[in-house]
Amino acid sequence: MSLAALGVVFGDIGTSPLYAIRECFHGEFSIPVNTPNVLGVLSLLIWALLLIVTLKYLTFIMKADNEGEGGILALTALIISHSKKNKSERWILVSLGLFGAALLYGDGMITPSISVLSAVEGIQIIAPSFGPLVIPVTIAILAGLFLFQHHGTAKVGSFFGPIILLWFTSIGLCGLVEIVKYPAILKAVFPWYGLEFLVNNHAKGFLVLGAVFLAVTGAEALYADMGHFGRRPIRLTWSLLVLPALLLNYFGQGAVLLSEPAKSWNPFYALVPSWGIIPMVILATLATIIASQALITGIFSLTQQGIQLGYIPRLTVQHTSASHIGQIYVPAANWALMFSTIALVAGFGSSSKLASAYGVAVTATMLISAVLFYYVARDLWNWNRLGLNLLMGMFMLIDLSFFGASVSKLFHGAWFPLVIGFALFTLMLTWKQGRLLLMKQIQDRTLTVSEFTESLAIQQPQRVKGQAIYLTANPDVVPMALLHNMRHNKILHSEVGLLHFSTERVPRVPNSKKVEVIQLNYGMYKIIARYGFMEYPNIRQVLALANQQGMHFRTDAISYFINREKIVTGMKSKMSVWRKKLFALMARNALSATAYYDLPSGQVIEIGVQVQI
């Protein structure tokens, strides 16, 4: 794996040592610092890394790739494209996948906040008087990070890898020094210390699991980034560099707690010698910025996938690199994240308080990923039922334990990512259902392509020389823009293309299968452009590929006709009135087809159509 990829994939999980151990002994549900508790918490944390990250995600979940792509939406699309289940079962699985994706937005708001804030707080160790500056400095760093997004990361990306490599090396060495001083801490590798801790501490021990989970919050990112860097490089880098560095640092923090319990308020920086505090604060800040950048990029990618799959309204998506197609910038998502993270930092005031809000969204997403993986392994791969049930039983027990512990923090801030998740989930389902209802209404008011061509055989309108392309949401029906144009202007161009963009349930579609041209009678063509959910439609590419199949359309001579729907509510249907009004509001504010498909504005004719839903 390239050095640049190191920061993208492992930035989130790599910065967890800043706050994970601290929250167990100095957080909302903290426990006393003593030998049994330190060994128990450390044992739970180590085995969480081994069982959740190494075994569950890197060994099993990453097997479920959608033509190389990972992530919860890719996993959901894999199930949709291969599932033979009835509609209700598919709807449940799709809804689970969508809710998991929606929860990741809540995580995307909290991760930059807690990561950068916990790094900047280190300066208080040297100069406690700088305490009042922590929040303003954190907000300034976050604001700068988001304001820089439209420039892309191509120029600074080459620095990410070396910085993260230095980060892992530094935190590993700091931990190793303390382990040498207190080698007895290595006993925590035995799992019975963790089990004994849970038994002896009863409910309080269970609640501490919510803080232990903070060490593995970046596991879902490893799966999501699989398409960019590959399964094998991620596994190797984890095994040879990241996991050893994390274990050394966590063991080192445990050793510090046993030798100097008073330092439980920030055991990470307690590992660092006094002369190295300032360099470590700078390095930690850079590492958390890189981790935040990776998560922001992931949110941009998730948003693009949601748009392509039809669950998010069309938004502006800008490409920030000519050589790397995956580097994109989504302004709406960027500003929403920016204001949310700044509000969280100002509202919670410390990384310790933010930690109470962190984790519940990720645990829920991990639970959902496990459920979706179960159906893939059972229905698509036909795994042995007994072995699969035992494996998933173990994973579900672990995930449910962490989820239950995280939910206990509901009134301490954990409500925030859940509210965000439910709100976005509602918006996604409303948009999808509204579009289906809208398409049905349009389809009922228009003609099929075959009916239209048959009508031309009976009576043709006046044909004018020229080329026209009509965008259509359904390749089998004539767009209303064409019928309205004929009704009002009484003309039809000599060459007409009915263009339909179809998003497939795969990440990418090869050029050889991307465009299908079906020649109809009377100078008409049906053009079906197929794109994957990781791709961005390109009208010029479509026309170039279509012209290779017998069309002769000139890009500078085409008139593009598109519908401009005005949605009014009132028709009786299964969709509630408030959701119809919400859908109409979303449709009014969605990016126009002209802007989304980058059509030449001087060649576009929009025809208004009123549709009642």
UniProtKB/Swiss-Prot annotation:
Keyword vocabulary terms for this entry: Cell inner membrane, Cell membrane, Ion transport, Membrane, Potassium, Potassium transport, Symport, Transmembrane, Transmembrane helix, Transport
Reaction(s) this enzyme catalyzes, per UniProt: K(+)(in) + H(+)(in) = K(+)(out) + H(+)(out)
Protein task: Transport of potassium into the cell. Likely operates as a K(+):H(+) symporter.
Pfam family, one: K_trans
Gene Ontology cellular-component annotations: plasma membrane
Its membrane topology: Multi-pass membrane protein
Name under which the protein is recorded: Probable potassium transport system protein Kup
Organism expressing this protein natively: Chlorobaculum tepidum (strain ATCC 49652 / DSM 12025 / NBRC 103806 / TLS) (Chlorobium tepidum)
Subcellular location: Cell inner membrane
InterPro entries: K+_transporter, K_trans_C, K_trans_N, Kup
Gene Ontology MF terms: potassium ion transmembrane transporter activity; symporter activity
Family label: Belongs to the HAK/KUP transporter (TC 2.A.72) family.
Transmembrane domains' residue ranges: 38-58, 91-111, 128-148, 159-179, 206-226, 238-258, 270-290, 328-348, 357-377, 387-407, 410-430
Organism taxonomic ancestry: Bacteria, Pseudomonadati, Chlorobiota, Chlorobiia, Chlorobiales
Signal peptide: none
Record keyword Ubl conjugation present: no
Keyword Transmembrane helix: yes
